[in-house]
């Protein structure tokens, strides 16, 4: 453990005290205090009520220290405090807003919870055949969007797939809070990691990426119209991407992205560009009873002979091998992949 890491661990222990058992548990993803009760989200146990009660002095002490670090006011006039600290995303709402202070902590570990190909197959997260396909999609430089509802693990799949990006191809990683940890999970690979702020937003950094020799845009989430439009322009210049979005059906993604942009004057052009420049959509779902996460849909997007296509090659357990459009097959072939359902021999290192 290096000096910086030791200092971070000491600060964690000082700041979070009674919450440390949960913070140190790799299975815990979220810690939520609503002013009365402490709720824990665990990838194995689900969401449950803890018997720990937080004193108001603990919350006050925590937000005072965090607001000082951020040099940010936190009071009835500025009642929302959002920050990143020691690989955690922290949100605190002031008591003037919610009567009692509310705290939310999301753990963003610098490792991949989908630890290995073997783990993915053993847990039935994805079949071997479909996992081969997804890995080959990255190898073939497809543009990929990972969809799902909150807390299903979209970012974890994104992190896993980045392992197949060639080391010598620069990745631009753009996010509000450091969640992807590209440099840590892909040591030795070329990348620039950008945490967005009020000075530089998604639209500006995505547009600037081309002139910065970025070959892969890794976007934590496509959720703003201007950012989506900038991303499509980015892809039209030959940049590749992996991103996430909130959805429960990958067939709806083109319309969802189009609605984000909201430019009715250029409606046909924009929707056509979504199909032209996006290639693959992956839906991740979670069983609320068992907490089991899995890939439930794989959808392809293509514009063929003036028509927009979105065939599913996997839909809740059913495989459709022959549904790959000609333009997608051509993309695979360009990178020497004749059968996209065969295993990638190694990660790109």
Where are these regions (language model features)?
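P-loop NTP-binding catalytic core
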Residues: 25, 41, 45-140
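Conserved lysine of the Walker
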Residues: 154
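Switch/coupling sub-region of P-loop NTPases
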Residues: 162-273, 286
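NTP-binding/hydrolysis catalytic cores, primarily Walker-type P-loop NTPases
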Residues: 1-22, 290-349
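Walker A (P-loop) phosphate-binding loop of P-loop NTPases
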Residues: 151
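Hydrophobic positions on the alpha1 helix immediately C-terminal to the Walker A/P-loop
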Residues: 157, 161
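Hydrophobic anchor at the beta1->P-loop junction of P-loop NTPases
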Residues: 146-148
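Walker A (P-loop) ATP-phosphate-binding motif of ABC ATPase nucleotide-binding domains
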Residues: 143
């Amino acid at each position: 453990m290096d000096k910086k890491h030791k200092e971070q661990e000491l600060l964690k222990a000082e700041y979070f005290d009674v919450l440390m058992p949960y913070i140190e548990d790799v299975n815990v993803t979220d810690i939520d205090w609503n002013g009365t009760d402490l709720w824990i989200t665990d990838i194995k146990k689900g969401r449950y009520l803890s018997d720990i009660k937080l004193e108001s002095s603990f919350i006050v002490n925590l937000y005072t220290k965090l607001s000082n670090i951020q040099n940010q006011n936190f009071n009835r006039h500025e009642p929302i405090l959002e920050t990143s600290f020691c690989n955690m995303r922290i949100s605190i709402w002031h008591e003037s807003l919610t009567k009692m202070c509310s705290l939310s902590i999301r753990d963003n570990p610098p490792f991949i919870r989908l630890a290995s190909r073997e783990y993915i197959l053993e847990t039935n997260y994805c079949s071997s055949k479909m996992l081969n396909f997804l890995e080959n999609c990255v190898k073939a430089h497809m543009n990929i969007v990972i969809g799902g509802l909150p807390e299903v693990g979209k970012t974890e799949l994104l992190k896993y797939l980045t392992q197949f990006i060639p080391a010598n191809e620069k990745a631009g990683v753009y996010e509000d809070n450091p969640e992807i940890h590209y440099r840590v999970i892909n040591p030795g690979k070329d990348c620039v990691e950008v945490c967005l702020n009020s000075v530089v937003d998604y639209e500006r950094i995505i547009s600037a990426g081309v002139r910065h020799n970025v070959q892969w845009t890794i976007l934590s989430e496509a959720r703003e119209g201007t950012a989506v439009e900038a991303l499509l322009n980015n892809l039209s210049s030959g940049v590749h991407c992996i991103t996430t979005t909130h959805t429960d059906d990958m067939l709806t993604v083109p319309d969802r992205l189009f609605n984000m942009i909201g430019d009715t004057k250029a409606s046909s052009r924009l929707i056509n560009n979504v199909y032209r420049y996006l290639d693959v959509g992956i839906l991740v779902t979670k069983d609320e009873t068992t907490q089991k996460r899995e890939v439930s849909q794989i959808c392809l997007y293509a514009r063929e002979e003036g028509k927009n296509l979105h065939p599913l090659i996997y839909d809740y357990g059913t495989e459709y091998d022959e549904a790959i459009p000609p333009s997608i097959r051509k993309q695979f072939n360009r990178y020497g992949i004749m059968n996209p359902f065969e295993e990638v021999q190694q990660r790109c290192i």
